Amino acid sequence: MRGAICMLAALLGVVPTAQSAPPARVVSLAPNLTDMVRDIGAEETLVAVTPFCAAPEDLRRVPGGMQPEAEAVLALEPDLVLASSITPAATLRQLRDLGIRTEVFHTESLAQIRTAMAKLASVFEKTAAAETSDESAGTSRSAVLLFGADTGYSAGCGTHAHEILSAAGLRNIAAEASGPWPQLGEEFLLAADPDVIVVADYGGADKEQLLALLRRHPVRQHLDAVRSGRVVVFPAKAFSIPGPAALEAGELLRAEVEKL
């Protein structure tokens, strides 16, 4: 395997080089990193992304998605590969052994997302976006984030989604559940009876539709937030993809909560 990769590298003329200019051929192995490259204005450098990235249809997709084989990446002749914490260690090692500049970004928290954005801005010699605050808005309204009005999937401690709720001035009841991405039971929701329900929307739904769904639910119809209409519909991307949208989500969510 290693011999075949080295031979392919030789044929493509891939050799270690000093980084004297911003990268011109970039492969992104994660949707959030693709979003970051676009946000700083360097999208023209992308030569391939994962099938899960929001990118033009004519932009090549990396075979294997977010966990590709090194040969597939090497064949794209990149001068920079952007990888995440889930990129296989073997792939990272092989790419680096072949002299391909490979940067790994950890984005589990809002602070890490901001650090990644600043690092990418430096790499591409772009201006970093203005910082937003991660601090809590200082209120104590309890809330729950649900990935769908009829599911129990939520976000707990140790996730950037939890930090978004905190930045919006909300106390996340799922922080008391087990694990960073818990499945909340109906009894848990009834006992906690959150003041606000935030529904992560993947597109197409509006508040009235989701409220109607919640009010037909045999258990959730009894939640005070449902009876009183204290439901916020918010784009799911901010909670599910730790990228630029997450950094501004706290302020935007707080504004929506204040309208209730």
Regions found by a protein language model. Name each.
Residues 30, 85-86, 147-150, 177, ...:
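Short secondary-structure boundary segments
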Residues 50, 158-181, 201:
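His/Asp/Glu-enriched short active-site or ligand-binding loop at hydrolase and phosphoryl-transfer sites
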Residues 4-15:
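Bacterial N-terminal signal peptides
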Residues 22-37, 123-168:
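Basic- and aromatic-lined ligand-binding clefts that recognize polyanionic substrates
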Residues 24, 110-125, 138, 203-260:
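Structured C-terminal subdomain patch of bacterial secreted/periplasmic proteins
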Residues 18-20:
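Boundary at the C-terminal end of the N-terminal hydrophobic targeting segment
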Residues 24-86, 133, 170-173, 220:
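A short, structured surface patch at a secondary-structure boundary
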Residues 65, 69-86, 100, 185-202:
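Proline-aspartate-enriched helix->loop->beta-strand connector
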